[in-house]
């Protein structure tokens, strides 16, 4: 995987209250590209953070339907990945994951 693809796969951290609780169990949540696969996400995290990844779980979040002045509209959906690191590995520079 080339360096350019690494930065296109991981779009950024997804920080929520649920993600903060998951970080306590060595699981970190990232927003990822719609076409990203589990092996790509694993390689991207290992290349970017230099940590060993134990597993990756991926899910698609559907956009919400919202009413507008002109009828119904649809918000954009996204894809997120729960990345579990190997035992003893943590991401210190992961903001908000204390």
Curated annotation (Swiss-Prot):
PROSITE patterns per the UniProt record, alphabetical: RIBOSOMAL_L23 (PS00050)
One CC-aspect GO term: ribosome
Listed Gene3D superfamilies: 3.30.70.330
Keyword field contains Ribonucleoprotein: yes
Tagged with keyword Ribonucleoprotein: yes
GO MF: rRNA binding; structural constituent of ribosome
Region forming the signal peptide: none
Keywords, comma-separated and alphabetical: Ribonucleoprotein, Ribosomal protein, RNA-binding, rRNA-binding
InterPro entries: Nucleotide-bd_a/b_plait_sf, Ribosomal_uL23-like, Ribosomal_uL23/eL15/eS24_sf, Ribosomal_uL23_CS
GO terms (BP aspect): translation
Family per similarity comment: Belongs to the universal ribosomal protein uL23 family.
Subunit structure: Part of the 50S ribosomal subunit. Contacts protein L29, and trigger factor when it is bound to the ribosome.
Annotated HAMAP family: Ribosomal_uL23_B
Job description of the protein: One of the early assembly proteins it binds 23S rRNA. One of the proteins that surrounds the polypeptide exit tunnel on the outside of the ribosome. Forms the main docking site for trigger factor binding to the ribosome.
Protein name, UniProt field: Large ribosomal subunit protein uL23
Organism: Chromohalobacter salexigens (strain ATCC BAA-138 / DSM 3043 / CIP 106854 / NCIMB 13768 / 1H11)
Gene symbol of the encoding locus: rplW
